[in-house]
Each structure stands twice: as structure tokens, then as C-alpha cells.
Amino acid sequence: MAAKNEWAEKDYYADLGVSSSATEAEIKKAYRKLARENHPDSHPGDAAAEERFKKVAEAYDVVGDETKRKEYDEFRSMIASGGFGGAGFPGGFRTQEGFDFDLGDIFGSGAGRGHAPQGGFGDIFGGIFNRGGGARNAARPTRGSDVETEITLEFREAAKGTTIPLQLTGDAPCHTCHGSGSRSGAPTTCTECNGTGFTSENKGAFGFSAPCTQCGGTGKMISDPCPDCSGTGTQRRTRSITVRIPAGVVDGQKVRLAGQGEAGPNGLPAGDLYVTVHVKNDRVFTRSGDDLEVTVPVSYAELALGDTISVPTLDLPVRVRIPSGTPNGRVLRVRGKGVPKRGGSAGDLLVKVEVTVPSSLDAASASALRAYVQAERDAGFDPRAGWAGK
């Protein structure tokens, strides 16, 4: 979900298609409708639908929460009333009590120590105005970096799901200090910020805070840095993991594995791993959503007289009955033999029957076929009866 420092660029009410005066029930109804229409399960492989779904979820995360919505509305009201001066907000703003703040002093646009606001309006404004400047404005890391990789699967592996080994090279927890960054494995709590990572200061009715300069915003102090990782808690190395690919993935789909990305510094959580799946074509099957399609060659006699034939599936073959008089190209449906779905069910197997004509006939077969043709004529059968081109 978006951080508060992105609220200035968002119109969450418009994203949900409601007015800013919409009730809680109206917002929830709009969210459910849009989430259902754009859910990734309904649009596998559709990146645009996935992006719309994320946008709607982000909007509802803010305006669907009473506390966040109040802060968001207050911020929009402040912007709309001209509470900030000029592009980039270089001037200042005035509270309702008429108290002037100089943004250069408050948000560190000038020289000296800057303070990122925290709490209520402080949280909102802190992210927005602490965008430029030097190292004091650097975002405090909260976890390790995400990692992206790609794999290629056979058609049937993707349809049924599989487990694959992967080797990844990147930041991993240090073996010596187990990710703490400390030789003893026990960093101490920063006495300057009492472990919060921030130091606070009050200016009138507002409270402001900034990353602690003593600990760099981590809340921890390392007096005995680990010699193998120089106190970072991470080492760059190659590691092997096993990745479970769920059944039914489609070509181009991304699978997210939480916590399998690069390790965070000084014991912070790891990032996520995103695996983009590529799927090879199959010689027998094609896919339509959760259904499998297969074309089976049959003889004219099997269609005319009816028969039972063996048809392949993702598992064992099944027996499929062809009713007598089945036309060429008819699709027969075998329920539950398609691509597995979440929850244990599966799509269907769509069997298209296609006549194969022999390229040559022996004397006995040719004689029998001629006898059949004569019998057709005697019975008055005309294959082109009712044909518009006749």
C-alpha cells in the first residue's frame, strides 16, 4: 500500500468511483465491485487488470479505514485551501490559529538539521516534504531488497504445479553474527532515541521527528561490529532454495514468495522474491482459461456408428463415448479433467473429434466402401441436401 508521502499525488475517491462525501457502505460496495471485476484470478496473466486491482486495493486501504480517511481528508483540505506556497511548497503554511511555519526550518530545505514530522499531520507532511536534500532525508530501510528471476516450465508442469530448485546470488544473513551485525550477536538499544529510531521535537501545536543521527534510524547501536560483514549483518553469497509453483500458472505470470529476497541489514526482514514463469507449448494440449483443449483423430465409422475412444489427460487417459451420428469437428466435454484450480476443483477437457481419411485402401476396404456408398444412394442420403451452394 502507498505510504503517506504519496497521498499528494493520489485521488483515492476517484480510483473507487465515489465522491469524497460517500458513506462507508458506499465505499465498501464500490471497492468490492471493482475488486471482483479486476481480480487476478479472473484475469490470469493480465498485467493491466492486476494493476487496476492493486490501485483499487490501495485506495480502499486508506479511505476504507476511518482513521486513515480522516487524515487523508484533512490533508486534501489543507492542500485545497492553499495552505502551502508555490510549486514544491517553498514558502510556508499557517495553522488555523494563525501561527506561521517556515518550511525551510521545519522540513530541512535549508542548512542545518531537518526534522521529518511524525504523527497525524506530522506523518503526512514528513514524507511529502523530506524528498530532497542530502543523507538526512534518506529513507530508513525497513527490509531487504526484492529479487526478480525467471524460469521456464513444461506445459504440464505449469498446469499441475511443481517444485523447482533455484540458486540466487545476493545479500544473505551473515553466518558469523546471524544477521545482527554484532560480533557478540547482541546490538544494544540506542540511548539517544530509546530504540525508536527517531528523535522528536515540538514546535507549537505540532510534533516533529527525524531519524536519529546517533543510530542512523535503526534504533540499535553496534559497539562490536562483526568482522566478517563489517557490521551490516549481511554477506553476498549464492544460496539454494526450493520454490513451489502453484498449479494453473500461465505464461508471463509472476509468483511472489514473501521473505525470499535479499536479507535486510542488521536483522531487518528480507525482501520478497518474484518469479516470472514462462510456459512452453505442448504437443497435445492447448489451454483456454482453466479448460484444456485436445484434438483427437477418429474414423468416419466411429462418428457415424458411435464408439468409445481413449483420450489423454494431464494424468491417466480417460474413455470418452462418441454418440452415433456425431458430426466432424464436434467438441465433447469431459468435466473436471482440465487445469487444477485453487480450492481443489479443475476446469474441463474439451475433446474435438476430427475425421482422418485413409490415404490408400486395399481391395477389400475399397469394395466395402463402394457398397456403402451405393447403400447411401439407395437410402436417399444426400450429404449436400440443404446446402446453400447447391
UniProtKB/Swiss-Prot annotation:
SMART domains: DnaJ (SM00271). CXXCXGXG motif repeats lie at residues 174-181, 190-197, 212-219, 226-233. Its main location: cytoplasm. GO terms for biological process: chaperone cofactor-dependent protein refolding; DNA replication; protein refolding; response to heat. It holds the Pfam family DnaJ_CXXCXGXG. Binds 2 Zn(2+) ions per monomer. Zn(2+) 1 binds at C174, C177, C226, C229. GO terms for molecular function: ATP binding; heat shock protein binding; unfolded protein binding; zinc ion binding. Keywords: Chaperone, Cytoplasm, DNA replication, Metal-binding, Repeat, Stress response, Zinc, Zinc-finger. It comes from the Bacteria. Zn(2+) 2 binds at C190, C193, C212, C215. It is found in: Cytoplasm. Belongs to the DnaJ family. Homodimer. NCBIfam families: DnaJ_bact, PRK10767.1, PRK14279.1. This is Chaperone protein DnaJ 2. It comes from Corynebacterium diphtheriae (strain ATCC 700971 / NCTC 13129 / Biotype gravis).
